[in-house]
Amino acid sequence: MQHRAATDFWQQYHALSPEVRARADKQFSLLKANSQHPSLQFKKVGERHGQEIWSARVTLNHRALAIRRDDGYLWFWIGDHKAYESLIS
């Protein structure tokens, strides 16, 4: 599966602290190697407009969201857990 990131994702990514960005890079590498790794908690969290929404853990307090597509995942959001909760509810 391919993983791509939307422009908004990159803007949010660059607004994160250097420590969180480094962890996001590590988790993304892990995701590409083994999407079932327990530290990722990679899972479907909902559906909007007929598209599956998937989540991956970045840190204890940060998550990333993607839309599942035929050819892989489009990552559209990364941020803190509080904002994540409001996005998926």
Model region roles, listed by residue range:
Residues 2-7, 11, 15, 51, ...:
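Enriched for short, Lys/Arg-rich terminal
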Residues 30-56:
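A short, surface-exposed loop/turn module that caps and links secondary-structure elements
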